[in-house]
Amino acid sequence: MNAVRWEKARFWRILSPRFAGAPLSGEGAARHGGRWNRPGQPALYLPCDIETAFAEYQQEMGVRPGTFVAYEVSNATIVDLADAATRRSVGLKAADLTAPWKPIAWVDKLEPATWRAADRLLAASDGARVPSAAWPGGFNLVLWRWNQADGARVSFHDPLNDLAP
């Protein structure tokens, strides 16, 4: 596995109105789990570009209200799962990246391969760069740790304090 340090990068996210007052929370992802996190494991999913942010937010639900937010991530140790050799080193196949994780976990009661890979990555990284399953050619940064004593730092741009709870 090849983890690299990201010094500073910009990301985007659309927040549900329900979570707009907590833009740094990973509790929405922890509630039911996500493609790259088990239920109970907080995660922050940050699309790398605006188009991917919209596609990820809509997914199978279509257009719905949301708050568009710009994020800055710095000092993060990241594993790039867009790289085939890195994927193989954590036991993932290309098909695992877009496999239908919800039916695998919720209907079949099995562990998605992405959860097992994330378990292995947690010890050595703050997160991973992953291809978007919602937007072909798009990427997301998934963080499992942020704003702790050391490691990844995440902030968001809110000059007018619009996201205050």
Predicted regions and their residues:
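Active-site and NAD+-binding cores of ADP-ribose-processing enzymes
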Residues: 1-31, 35-38, 60-165
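Extended catalytic/binding region for NAD+/ADP-ribose chemistry, centered on the ART fold
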Residues: 34-61
